[in-house]
Amino acid sequence: MIVVTGATGSVGQHLVQNLHSQQVEVVAAVRDQTRASVPEGVRSVAMDVENLASVEKAVAGADAVFWLWPSLSGSETAEVGGDIGRILGASGARVTYLSAEAAAAEPTSSWAIMENAIEQAVAEWTILRCTGFAKNVRMWIPQIQSGDTVRWPFANAIRSLIHEADIADAAAATLIDKTHIGQRYTLTGPSALR
């Protein structure tokens, strides 16, 4: 059984569908089961990262867990990161953590802190460090359609955005195939945008 946290989010919904279509037993961990829309045949479980007992219950009995951590500050993550790591480690599940490319350069970021907590406590882990999500550029559509210029704080920055379904495909592979244990992968899109 594979537990997908953030199962109704940008990546999670694609991952649940991907695993379900491969006839993998998948459990969707969601904050509010009454509002969650999951494919027929997929079980959901209530989980809120602010309630450690719910996290422990959600991952109990899992063979693998896709772990998604909200973008909190590094200090907020540091407060509970060790507890989360211990819960995931005690479950005995393989863990794939969706991190960010920035974790490598920012050791005090929430991503780096959570990576460290998982690596310290979980026997079998994989880290996916993503660049920007492609869907985030949709916020520019109204601005562009109105004839305006999109302004970016770093005018010469080049980004390689990745579609959320592609992240889900990579996550599914790491959750199913044990050859990815102990690996860190940086996931990027097919081309760089300036």
Regions found by a protein language model. Give the residues of each.
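Oxidoreductase cofactor-interface core, primarily capturing Rossmann-like NAD(P)-dependent enzymes
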Residues: I2-P39, E50-A53, A60-A62, S71-A78, ...
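Cofactor-binding loops of NAD(P)H-dependent oxidoreductases
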Residues: V45-M47
